[in-house]
Amino acid sequence: MEIINLTEGAFDAAVAQGVTLVDFWATWCGPCKMMGTILEQQVVPQLEGVDARICKVNVDDSPALAARFEVLSIPTLLFFKDGALAARMEDVQTPETVVGKVKELIS
């Protein structure tokens, strides 16, 4: 599984089908870096073979997306199922919490 960097133009198509986790972050955000490391090193390996996607949206590069989903603090994780927002988590999360939510949405 590879983490996909999304822009505004590609967002809707990326979340349209299946389960998609989107990490809203910024380069200057310390907790975002921690969450990014957790996603890359712990969540991705646990979700290998699972029918889901993990994407990232830089809020500085895509402020309209952050506004659209009322992302007021970062990191914010949004979970989509077939294009609909299904769950939201703010601040740094444990890998178990993130993986658990993805698997819950798949079942």
Give the location of each predicted region.
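N-terminal "domain-start" segment that seeds a small globular fold
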Residues: M1-A13
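Conserved helix-turn-beta segment immediately C-terminal to the redox Cys motif
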Residues: V19, G36-V57
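Non-catalytic, surface beta->alpha helical segment in thiol-disulfide oxidoreductase systems
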Residues: K81-S107
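Conserved Rossmann-like nucleotide-binding pocket used by diverse enzymes
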Residues: E2, W25, C55
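Structural microenvironment flanking redox-active thiols in thiol-disulfide oxidoreductases
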Residues: V57-L65
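Short active-site neighborhood of thiol/selenol oxidoreductases, capturing the structured segment around
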Residues: V15-W25
